[in-house]
């Protein structure tokens, strides 16, 4: 999920989907007008995602369906929570939240192909073009990108 998607996610709906379908549909806070039933983006839920959803529900303000308090703007949340958290990431040599998306993409590539992502020294593209392409299509979908070439920025190119 993008940071905005995570902040604005309808947590009760995601928990319901996770428990009943084993996957969640990313709809809120999406980029480029791709939201709701018109542009479904179903993501399989593993134990890590379940844990993250449970934690998000625990820290969600009373009366809120997402991470924002009812009187809080997205900008206020950015200033109060995101900026300090970004500073913590930087203290651990991470440039920001986008690097966490890249780590997720690399992990998914490895789960799908059973090879390291190209950026981590993997060579799946050289040994199995079809499997590499399948992984890129899936990861592109999960990240909410309409073009698979964008995935190369996260997992590395095909060289």
Please describe what each predicted stretch is:
Residues 101-145:
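C-terminal catalytic core of tyrosine-transesterase DNA break-rejoin enzymes
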């Amino acid at each position: 999920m993008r940071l905005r998607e995570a902040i604005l996610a309808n947590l009760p709906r995601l928990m319901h989907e996770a428990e009943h379908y084993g996957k969640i549909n990313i709809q809120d806070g999406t980029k480029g007008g791709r939201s709701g039933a018109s542009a479904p983006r179903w993501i399989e839920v593993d134990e890590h995602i379940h844990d993250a959803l449970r934690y998000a529900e625990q820290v969600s303000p009373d009366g809120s369906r997402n991470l924002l308090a009812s009187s809080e703007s997205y900008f206020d949340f950015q200033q109060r929570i995101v900026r300090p958290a970004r500073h913590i990431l930087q203290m651990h040599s991470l440039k920001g939240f986008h690097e966490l998306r890249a780590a997720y993409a690399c992990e998914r590539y490895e789960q799908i192909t059973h090879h390291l992502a190209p950026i981590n020294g993997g060579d799946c593209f050289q040994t199995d073009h079809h499997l590499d392409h399948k992984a890129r299509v899936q990861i592109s979908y999960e990240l909410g990108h309409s073009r698979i070439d964008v995935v190369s920025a996260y997992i590395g190119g095909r060289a």
